[in-house]
């Protein structure tokens, strides 16, 4: 069955990125480079946005209720998707974003510099009375600087 909408979809994600001064920020971005095609013929066409990566590691984490990490940078550029529960990310510019199941974050705050309080990267932790289960896809690539919303 072929049921194709004429307008390509968009998917929102939060990009945690570092500016040229070493300060981390978050920007709400859109994945919007979709084409309609079969992922594996003869399957019917669907909207696809393929982002080629040189390699990746998939990590699952379970953050307990009340968990708060210390300020830190993401170890690699990485896609983070909550599967259940809620979590927050606070960047050095003071912005705090809370995310739940199905929302997406791209953690790319490498190369930050300590602020006046000694903070680098971001602070994150659980929100609410349930653990937060995250799926993380760590990319084996060099992080960018001063380039919000680089994935489209």
Language-model-detected regions and their locations in the chain:
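Conserved short histidine dyad/triad with adjacent acidic residue
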Residues: 31-34, 38-46, 56-74, 99, ...
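Short acidic-glycine-tyrosine-enriched beta hairpin
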Residues: 93-111
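Short, conserved beta-strand element in jelly-roll/cupin
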Residues: 62-65, 73-89
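Short, ordered coil/turn segments that flank beta-strands lining enzyme active or ligand-binding pockets
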Residues: 19-20, 83, 92
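A short hydrophobic beta-strand segment most commonly corresponding to one strand
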Residues: 106-114, 118-144
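A short, N-terminal "cap"/entry segment at the start of jelly-roll beta-barrel domains
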Residues: 1-54, 149-152
């Amino acid at each position: 069955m072929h049921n194709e909408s004429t307008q390509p979809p968009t998917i929102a994600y939060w990009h945690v990125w570092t500016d040229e001064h070493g300060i981390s920020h978050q920007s709400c971005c859109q994945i919007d480079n979709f084409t309609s095609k079969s992922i594996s013929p003869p399957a019917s066409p669907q909207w696809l946005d393929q982002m080629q990566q040189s390699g990746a590691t998939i990590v699952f984490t379970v953050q307990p209720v009340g968990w708060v990490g210390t300020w830190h940078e993401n170890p690699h550029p990485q896609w983070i998707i909550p599967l259940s529960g809620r979590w927050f990310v606070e960047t050095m510019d003071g912005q705090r974003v809370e995310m739940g199941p199905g929302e997406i974050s791209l953690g790319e705050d490498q190369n930050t510099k300590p602020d006046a309080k000694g903070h680098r990267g971001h602070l994150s932790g659980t929100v609410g009375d349930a653990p937060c289960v995250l799926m993380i896809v760590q990319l084996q690539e060099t992080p960018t600087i001063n380039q919000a919303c680089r994935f489209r």
